[in-house]
C-alpha cells in the first residue's frame, strides 16, 4: 500500500492543483490530509492564488481517496462544503507492527502526545516544517512540512509511505530524506 501525506494547503488553489497533479503521478492508495485545508489563518500571509472555493472543488474531486484530519484553521463551515470528513482530531493507521497516529499537531504533538505505545509514530503538520525526530518511548515524530506555506526556508513539500519507507519530497517529486520503519 502507498500513502501520500500532505498538510497545510491554507486555501491555495495553485498548490491544490500541484497536489492534484502529485496524486495523479504518485498514484497512492490513499491521500492523508493533515488539516488546514481552506483558510489561511490569522498568522499567515495569503498563500499564492488564495481561492478556497476552487480548492474545495479540487479536493471534492479527490474525495474517494482522501482521509483528512482537522487543523486549527478548519471549521464546521468547511465541512459543509467538503464532501469527505475533515473534523476528526486524529486517525490511527496500523502499519506493520506499529501504529501511525496522524493529526494536525495543534492538539497532539511531541509536547502533548497522544497515548502512544513504545515504537509508535506521531505524524502531524501544523508547524509547516518537515521533521523526523525521535522522542518519548522510542517513538518518532514525522512532519511532511507544508504544501503551500513552508517555513524556516524549507521546500514546499509532502511525504509518501511505501513498503515501510517514509520519503520526504519537494513538490517537483524530488526525494530529499527517507526513513525506513523497522518492525
Q: Which residues fall in each region the model found?
A:
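Short, Lys/Arg-enriched, disordered terminal segments
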Residues: 1, 180-183
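Amphipathic repeat-derived elements
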Residues: 1-13, 28-30, 93, 141, ...
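Fold-independent oxyanion-binding glycine-rich loops
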Residues: 8-9, 36, 72, 104-105, ...
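Generic structural signal for conserved hydrophobic packing positions in ordered secondary structure
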Residues: 59, 93, 102-104, 145
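Conserved beta-sheet core of the metallophosphoesterase superfamily
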Residues: 99, 106-179
